[in-house]
Amino acid sequence: DALVNKGRGRNIGIDITLERFLEKGLYYMISGSLFDSRYRGGDGVWYNTKFNRNYVINGLIGKEWMLGRNKQNILSINLKLTLQGGDRYSPIDMEATMKHPDKEVQYDERKAFSKQYSPMLIGNYTVSYRINKKKVSHEFAVKGLNFMGTKEHYGHEYNVKTGKIDATD
């Protein structure tokens, strides 16, 4: 049988941004997106896409201080927070999973991406020091990525010890 693509995709949304450019060493930006991302399969039914989180809100704030004999070096601190809807996933077909010889997780694609994990709050920070000279500059930085330890989900797997299906982080 030849493959036929009778599907269709649709993405709609709105973005808004509020930004303050560097003034007296302070800057910030707040942005938000509300969106809906769906596709229509060959069966004519509209489904969520895997990436349909529905919303993302970002906040960034930072401060810079000019240091050094001629105020040519920069000490910088910034913080970024992101709140976003959870990842989408398809429900697990337990019966098909248990029948699979390797217990590989099988998903119910008739309900594709109808489930959604909890919203995620992710935080990052940076502290840096930049040394500026006539023909060269150096920057030293410490970054904390996902410093709150938010888990992101990558799928599911069968746990042989417990006989249950676990989310993979």
What positions do the PLM features span?
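Extracellular beta-rich repeat passengers
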Residues: 57, 104-105, 116
